[in-house]
Swiss-Prot record:
Gene3D superfamilies, per database record: Photosystem II protein D1-like
Assembly, per entry: PSII is composed of 1 copy each of membrane proteins PsbA, PsbB, PsbC, PsbD, PsbE, PsbF, PsbH, PsbI, PsbJ, PsbK, PsbL, PsbM, PsbT, PsbX, Psb30/Ycf12, peripheral proteins PsbO, CyanoQ (PsbQ), PsbU, PsbV and a large number of cofactors. It forms dimeric complexes.
Gene that this polypeptide is encoded by: psbA2
Enzyme class: oxidoreductase
Propeptide, residue positions: 345-360
Manner of cofactor binding, per the entry note: The D1/D2 heterodimer binds P680, chlorophylls that are the primary electron donor of PSII, and subsequent electron acceptors. It shares a non-heme iron and each subunit binds pheophytin, quinone, additional chlorophylls, carotenoids and lipids. D1 provides most of the ligands for the Mn4-Ca-O5 cluster of the oxygen-evolving complex (OEC). There is also a Cl(-1) ion associated with D1 and D2, which is required for oxygen evolution. The PSII complex binds additional chlorophylls, carotenoids and specific lipids.
GO biological process: photosynthetic electron transport in photosystem II; response to herbicide
Membrane topology classification: Multi-pass membrane protein
Remaining remarks: Cyanobacteria usually contain more than 2 copies of the psbA gene.
Protein name as catalogued: Photosystem II protein D1 2
Provenance organism: Gloeobacter violaceus (strain ATCC 29082 / PCC 7421)
Keyword Nucleus applies: no
Length: 360
């Protein structure tokens, strides 16, 4: 009997490329969204690393007072950052070819726009890639929906908020201390701590942490014993096994009696949906809060909200926080805001009791 071997037709190069890109057998799934994601995230990462190490000072406020952000200009890992593009640039698109020279581009903070725009395109593509990979594997699409929460947060602080404020110099710096600086100034200008949407975000993050810790500890405490005392309990689970690895009835019984019956889930699917939805919705809402505050729909104002029978203000913690906000406003952008109107136009508000001054 004769055996005939024939080389399988692989089609044209485009088909080979398309099959490789969309193959779920690759160690690293690329996908069509990955074709966009890989170069943009690589560009953002390379520019960020180079700028963090070696970028010269940037005139962020547009008043000829450059701010140093790189390691070679005296910073460390904590203080270093990629400084936002100059207020003189505003919302203008500022690629390298728009500047008269590389020195001008660096002085005006061009690397910030390069990093941020490529990063945003990259994480949008990563979200699409999550959907694409789920689709090809026959999974439901909720992984990319969950990832949309941090994507919304990044979009809010790097794109929507600066657009609302009129300049990319108001965007968040790409560094540790720069992030804190952004938070302080945001509080001073928008009173974010008194904004309901931020409160939802706090509940989402803290609540999500609490629920994750509760769920993990309950499951770990109610594992079905499948090993001896000499082995780790983790060896009692075999990847892909059909049997449940923990006793949900025992976990429900414990938690239902620890709190009350209806605080404990009896359905594993609804439990895990809740664990995903709580932090995601919270971060969605706080991202929405950043966006609306970008257009100056600020937090609640309870300043001087309590008065005595003669109309004099009885100071509350809201007034103390307001004084801190005003102090932060005075300190940042000093040459641009020497005397904020809300400081110069009102009488001073004492923030200490008379006893603290030594009376009596």
């Amino acid at each position: 009997m004769a055996t005939i071997l024939r080389r399988r037709s692989l089609g044209n190069p485009w088909e080979q490329f398309a099959n490789w890109i969309t193959s779920t057998d690759n160690r690293f799934y690329i996908g069509w969204f990955g074709v966009l994601m890989v170069p943009t995230l690589l560009s953002a990462t390379i520019c960020f690393v180079v700028a963090f190490i070696a970028a010269p000072p940037v005139d962020m406020d547009g008043i000829r007072e450059p701010i140093s952000g790189s390691l070679l200009y005296g910073n460390n890992i904590i203080t270093g950052a990629v400084i936002p593009s100059s207020n003189a640039i505003g919302l203008h698109f500022y690629p390298i070819w728009e500047a008269a020279s590389m020195d001008e581009w660096l002085y005006n903070g061009g690397p910030y726009q390069l990093v941020v725009f490529h990063f945003l395109i990259g994480i949008f593509a990563y979200l699409g890639r999550e959907w694409e990979f789920s689709y090809r594997l026959g999974l439901r699409p909720w992984i990319c929906v969950a990832y949309s929460a941090p994507v919304a947060a990044a979009t809010a602080v790097f794109l929507i908020y600066p657009m609302g404020q009129g300049s990319f110099s108001d965007g968040m710096s790409l560094g540790i201390s720069g992030t804190f600086n952004f938070m302080f100034i945001f509080q001073a200008e928008h009173n974010i701590l008194n904004h309901p949407l931020h409160m939802f975000g706090v509940a989402g993050v803290f609540g999500g942490s609490l629920f994750a810790a509760m769920h993990g500890s309950l499951v770990t405490s109610s594992l079905i014993k499948a090993t001896s005392y000499e082995e780790s309990q983790n060896y009692g689970y075999k990847f892909g096994q059909e049997e449940e690895t923990y006793n949900i009835v025992a976990a429900h019984g414990y938690f239902g009696r620890l709190i009350f019956q209806y605080a404990s889930f009896t359905n594993s699917r609804s439990l895990h949906f809740f664990l995903a939805a709580w932090p995601v919705i919270g971060i969605w809402l706080t991202s929405l809060g950043i966006c609306v505050m970008g257009f100056n729909l600020n937090g609640f104002n309870f300043n001087a909200s309590i008065t005595d029978n003669q109309g004099r203000t009885i100071y509350t913690w809201a007034d103390i926080v307001n004084r801190a906000n005003l102090g932060i406003e005075v300190m940042h952008e000093r040459n641009a805001h020497n005397f904020p109107l809300d400081l110069a136009g009102t009488e001073s508000a004492p923030v200490a009791f008379a006893a603290a001054l030594g009376d009596g």
